[in-house]
Curated annotation (Swiss-Prot):
Necessary cofactors: FAD
Catalytic activities: 3-amino-4-hydroxybenzoate + NADPH + O2 + H(+) = 3-amino-2,4-dihydroxybenzoate + NADP(+) + H2O
Stored Pfam families: FAD_binding_3
Signal peptide extent: none
Residue numbers binding FAD: 16, 109, 287
Protein name per Swiss-Prot or TrEMBL: 3-amino-4-hydroxybenzoate 2-monooxygenase
GO MF annotations in UniProt: FAD binding; monooxygenase activity
Functional pathway: Antibiotic biosynthesis
Cofactor annotation comment: Binds 1 FAD molecule per subunit.
Length: 394
């Protein structure tokens, strides 16, 4: 088990930061989370939790909480933008659990955040502590905060997202704008009545754009994201802009994207995969390590894999955190690089113009719609600790 005398500081109270803190504190470790925001507010709306991520959350004791707040997806269904012609349907539901040992959940980010914060005492998360820089010393790491305060730790875990401050002490690079922007919103469940009997993820693919939507909040609300090519990362945009952008799309898509009372617009960023995720006593998790485009819906799920791998490595090397993070790095770099590479490729495939390339893509999707083709992503990965390898939370 992890050395209980080690002091661990986590920067960032997102999915990765809260989860790793919960696992470490379960082991009696002095672990504190430093979050720049003055209060915990979950940014965003829907999250797709695939079995590789759900297994981790089940291992934390959140099985009942996920079942109560999430929506168990029956399928991922892909259709063509204009006429709604079916392209592929990947069955999930019971089949997913049979293959991968956990369901596929659709959940509101705020609900997931509440599940994770319930695992920690309020004193474990220090709010309003914005990290300005990381100073690595021979015997410790010192965090410097923007308010002039400092904190020392034996190990610092950077879980502070795509614009990570902690990452600067490990890798010198910058986020890359991917050339796409996403509009996100929430609409009433009545907008997509078919979700009542067939809760699923809907993908609509078209030239230069795609739309995803699915039920969240126990089926009471539908989350959508509408992605389009955008050469410049400009702010703003509302439902009226979406109505114009998707004016020639299928009626259901138009109804979804124009039914929100408000939408948010975000540029999509990633970074190249570096040659390391750690240096000495500093290690990166989640988007701080490998920010990835969202086309595989793996942001939170890969972060959860990071957490179980890191904690498993710390368990295996008590008293030697630097060796543990080197092992974590060697295990996670190849895996996350493959997910990252495939996500970038899908950025092109999802937005092809109508024509021969689009037809070929649709045929490939039909040929791989059986969920067994997702074993590389959703199944247990050789050499990586999984939730069942970690002591369960009572």
């Amino acid at each position: 088990m992890v050395d209980r005398d080690i002091r661990i500081a986590v920067v960032g109270a997102g999915v990765a930061g809260l989860t790793v803190a919960a696992l470490l504190r379960d082991r009696g470790v002095d672990c504190r989370v430093f979050e720049r925001a003055p209060r915990l507010v979950a940014v965003g709306a829907g999250i797709q939790l695939s079995p590789n991520g759900v297994r981790v959350l089940h291992g934390l004791g959140l099985r009942d909480s996920l079942a109560a707040t999430g929506v168990r997806a029956r399928a991922i269904e892909t259709r063509s933008w204009a006429d709604g012609a079916p392209i592929a349907r990947t069955p999930l539901g019971d089949r997913c659990e049979e293959l991968y040992g956990a369901p596929y959940y659709l959940i509101h980010r705020a609900d997931l955040h509440r599940c994770l914060t319930s695992l920690l005492p309020a004193s474990a998360v220090e709010l309003g502590r914005a990290c300005a820089r990381v100073e690595e010393r021979p015997d410790a790491v010192r965090l410097h905060f923007t308010d002039g305060t400092m904190a020392d730790a034996d190990l610092v875990i950077g879980a502070d997202g795509v614009h990570s401050v902690v990452r600067r002490s490990v890798v010198r690079d910058a986020p890359r704008y991917a050339g796409y922007a996403v509009h996100r919103g929430l609409v009433p469940a009545s907008v997509v009545p078919s979700f009542r009997d067939d809760p699923r993820v809907m993908f609509w693919l078209g030239p230069g754009r795609h739309v995803t939507y699915y039920p969240v909040a126990g089926g009471r609300t539908v989350h959508f994201s509408a992605v389009g090519v955008s050469p410049e990362e400009s702010p703003g945009g509302g439902p009226e802009d979406l109505g114009a952008a998707f004016g020639h799309w299928h009626e259901e898509v138009r109804r979804v994207v124009t039914s929100a009372s408000s939408v948010t617009r975000w540029g999509l960023y990633d970074r190249d995969i570096p040659d390391r995720y750690a240096t000495g006593r500093v290690v990166l998790l989640g988007d701080a390590a490998h920010p990835t485009l969202p086309y595989l819906s793996q942001g939170a799920n890969q972060a959860l894999e990071d957490v179980t791998t890191l904690v498993g490595c710390l368990d295996a090397r008590p008293g030697a955190p630097q060796e543990a993070v080197r092992q974590y790095e060697s295990l996670r770099l190849p895996r996350t690089a493959e997910v990252h590479r495939r996500a970038r490729r899908l950025a092109e495939e999802f937005h092809l113009p109508d024509g021969p390339e689009c037809t070929d893509r649709d045929q490939r999707m039909r040929a791989t719609q059986d969920p067994t083709h997702l074993a590389w992503l959703y199944g247990r990965t050789a050499g990586l600790p999984d939730a069942s390898d970690l002591a369960p939370r009572p």
